[in-house]
Amino acid sequence: MHYLEQWNYCPKCGSKQFVVHDFKSKHCEACGFTYYFNAAAAVIAIIENEKGEMLVARRGEEPAKGTLDFIGGFVDPGEGFEEAVVREIEEETGWRGLTPGPWTPPAPLRGEKWREGSSYSQDGDGEERSNLKVLFSLPNTYLYSGLTIHSCDCFFHVLIPSDAKLKANDDVAACWWEKPENIKVEDFGLHSARIGLQRFLELKKKGKV
């Protein structure tokens, strides 16, 4: 099946002369427009607190409604990955203590206390740094309104205090802290979330996160 099989008309001029150009594109023989079906950019936040608990969410909307997931979503036009993951965390949990910036290790690893009410920490020169870090990326498919969207999901490791006031918003039905040993990969509804969780736990075992 061609990626654009459902697209029968040119999105620029409306002509029916919209034919296959290559495996991921179609070309309009009427106006010359060529459309390429490229992967959409998305972000996923694997969030931990200083106790080592992970923040899990229950999906409130299709696809995979009712299954577990991580906080995340698609990158908006004009955003970078870092800005997108901060926005998604704010939209879906209400937490506004993050700003894109250089990575700082968790406070417990530095022998320091977390600053109350903030996910920031300070390094030796007093510079404030954000506790979010890029982990890896994975391909994913996302069925929405009958159209299969191919995405490239960028995974972040994010640190938020356990006493942060979080409230499920947007398309998240609920979110809560959970011990890693109680989290089952098969309870996650989206493919990249399952694979991402497995990879993250493997990195944890190796001491790489």
Language-model segment annotations:
Residues 86, 94-105, 127-163:
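Active-site segment of metal-dependent pyrophosphate-handling enzymes
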Residues 49-91, 95:
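Conserved Nudix-box catalytic region and its N-terminal flanking loop in Nudix hydrolases
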Residues 30-54, 74:
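Conserved N-terminal beta-strand and adjoining loop/helix that marks the start
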Residues 111-116, 123-125:
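Glycine-biased, low-complexity coil/linker segments
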Residues 7, 25:
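Residues immediately within or flanking Cys/His clusters that coordinate Zn2+
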